[in-house]
From Swiss-Prot:
Keyword Amino-acid biosynthesis: no
Role noted for this protein: Catalyzes the synthesis of Und-PP-GlcNAc-ManNAcA (Lipid II), the second lipid-linked intermediate involved in enterobacterial common antigen (ECA) synthesis.
Top EC category: transferase
UniProt catalytic activity: UDP-N-acetyl-alpha-D-mannosaminouronate + N-acetyl-alpha-D-glucosaminyl-di-trans,octa-cis-undecaprenyl diphosphate = beta-D-ManNAcA-(1->4)-alpha-D-GlcNAc-di-trans,octa-cis-undecaprenyl diphosphate + UDP + H(+)
UniProt name for this protein: UDP-N-acetyl-D-mannosaminuronic acid transferase
Alphabetical keyword list: Glycosyltransferase, Transferase
UniProt EC number: 2.4.1.180
Name of encoding gene: wecG
Natural source organism: Escherichia coli O127:H6 (strain E2348/69 / EPEC)
Pathway this chain belongs to: Bacterial outer membrane biogenesis; enterobacterial common antigen biosynthesis
Domain of life: Bacteria
Length: 246
């Protein structure tokens, strides 16, 4: 068997993270032996680890997800520090989503999109069809009422979607995916946060050089100074990192 279809796991603060070497490894793992895996993909960064530490409900949600992977460079560095032999790299959630969509388009895999503003969702659908001929079997923007959730779950199930991506922010998207899987378990679910906004150009992502240097967080801070409180929270994570408490 190609060793790209398997991956080691590493533990940080009790979380079991998949160690992908690069994007190709991630894709080969998710499509092992030509069969798309089923379960829930959750991107893990330092901020999410802090949230998990302080919120038992969120911890339970994240722990239940089968595929937790290092989306943040700080998490990758922590894994490498704790496990010096680890061959793990950052796989950005936004990039992984695009690669999954490209693969889905190539193979005709049915996709259901959830979340985002109505106009952003419509633009996302159009771009996915035009760019990769993605077989979108249904969609729902993020503006639905709680009493409409069950009907939406049934609609997703009836669509036969094999990939369901949910852009509602954390922990809303994790709650949605957990509950939807009770009705439609046979799919790969992925929480994608603000990915639709980035994909359609409504939100600008850091230039590649900033991403390569692991400074995407700094670019976002300079672009949105209001994020300073969120960034200051990360000092706690840094303390864990440098004192070996991860």
């Amino acid at each position: 068997m190609n060793n790209n279809t398997t991956a080691p796991t590493y533990t940080l603060r009790g979380l079991q993270l998949i160690g992908w070497r690069d994007m190709q490894h991630a894709l080969d793992y998710l499509f092992a032996d030509g069969q798309l895996k089923q379960g829930t993909l959750v991107a893990i960064n330092a901020e999410k680890i802090l949230t998990i530490e302080d919120n038992a409900e969120v911890r339970e949600l994240i722990n239940a997800a089968e595929f937790k992977y290092a989306d943040g460079i700080s998490v990758v560095r922590s894994v490498r520090k704790k496990y010096p032999q680890a061959q793990v790299s950052r796989v950005a959630g936004a990039d992984l989503w695009e690669e999954l969509m490209a693969r889905a388009g190539k193979e005709g895999t049915p996709v259901f999109l959830v979340g985002g503003k109505p106009e952003v969702l419509a633009q996302t659908e159009a771009k996915l069809r035009n760019q990769w001929n993605v077989n979108i079997v249904g969609s729902q923007d993020g503006y639905f009422k709680p009493e409409q959730r069950q009907a939406l779950f049934e609609r997703i199930h009836a669509s036969g979607a094999q990939i369901v991506t949910v852009a509602m922010g954390s922990p809303k998207q994790e709650i949605f995916m957990r509950d939807c899987r009770l009705v439609h378990p046979d799919a790969l679910y992925m929480g994608v946060g603000g990915t639709y906004d980035v994909f359609t150009g409504h939100v600008k992502r850091a230039p590649k050089i900033w991403q390569t240097l692991g400074l995407e967080w700094l670019y976002r801070l300079l672009s949105q100074p209001s994020r300073i409180k969120r960034q200051l929270r990360l000092l706690r994570y840094l303390r864990w990192h440098y004192t070996g408490n991860l």
